[in-house]
């Protein structure tokens, strides 16, 4: 199963969403996504691989955060 979420939001709203995800990770071991009335829950183990990627190109920039387990 794969669920992708891509929306245009204000920088502050993006920061708030990242904070929500960080809070979920630090307070438990689930990440919850809700879309169209459906709730998706991913169990996250105590140890994960964290990948941070920053890319600058002529047309803009991209910053990615990826957790795998």
Go through each PLM region and give its residues:
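Charged, well-structured alpha/beta interaction segments
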Residues: 12, 30-32
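Proteins with a high burden of low-complexity, intrinsically disordered sequence enriched in S/T/G/P/A and R
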Residues: 17-18, 43
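Short, basic/low-complexity N-terminal boundary segments at the transition from targeting/disordered tails
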Residues: 6-14
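N-terminal intrinsically disordered, cationic/polar leader segments
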Residues: 1-4, 32-34, 38-69
């Amino acid at each position: 199963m794969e669920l992708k979420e891509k929306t245009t939001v204000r920088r502050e709203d993006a920061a708030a969403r990242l904070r929500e995800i960080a809070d979920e990770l630090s307070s438990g071991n689930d990440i919850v996504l809700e879309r169209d009335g459906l709730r998706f829950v991913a169990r996250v183990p105590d140890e994960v691989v964290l990948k941070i990627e920053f890319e600058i190109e002529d047309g803009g920039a991209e910053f990615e955060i990826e957790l795998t387990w």
